[in-house]
Amino acid sequence: MAGQPLRLDRGLVGLTLLAGASMSMGFIQLLAGPLENVANLSVQVLAVQTTAMAAPLVITLLLLLREGPALVGLGTRLVHRQPRALMRRWSYQAVRLIPTAVALLPYLLAAAMVSATLTKPELSSLTDLQFLAGNLSPGILVLSLLKTALFAGLVLWITLHQGRRARRLRLGGSAALSRAISLSIAMVLGLDLVWVLLLDPSVSGGGI
């Protein structure tokens, strides 16, 4: 529940592992055709890199589905509080939610790398797994960590604010939750798009 330390329970970790494995295998299938003449490890490396780039969106969605109802409910109880009280509550929740989001990233990437080695029988050794880990771009990893933390904080603010707004306008809990989820997804996707277009050198045309 909101207000209690969020633990990495088995269900949340399990969903993260499943998401990482599924994403990696999906990207490998997409890349295997166009890059069929490239060495297998190149395909796996690209798949893991792509998974790392998409990981913040997936982790944010998992946390939103898990914590959204409780956070919207918490927001409804802040309707008569001053804006400063809402900010204090956001800070308190951010201390537990943002580290949780960041902590899920290694699980997702580990599952992606393991599934990548299992897609090809010849890539099932520990050496190949270490190779995939070693070829994960530090820049992509840092960006994934930053975006995961940023998206988690943004979703936290949206859910609390929507709960507060719903209580003020006398909206139902389901309507508030639906709006919070829709707005959170739209904001995160939009921010990710702006990030890629403006800050990614490979897209914006800037130097590396």
At which residue positions do the language-model features occur?
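Selective transmembrane-helix segments that form parts of the transport pathway or gating/packing helices
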Residues: V13, L17, E67, L86-A110, ...
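Selective recognition of hydrophobic, aromatic-rich stretches within alpha-helical transmembrane segments
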Residues: L62, R66-E67, L141-G153
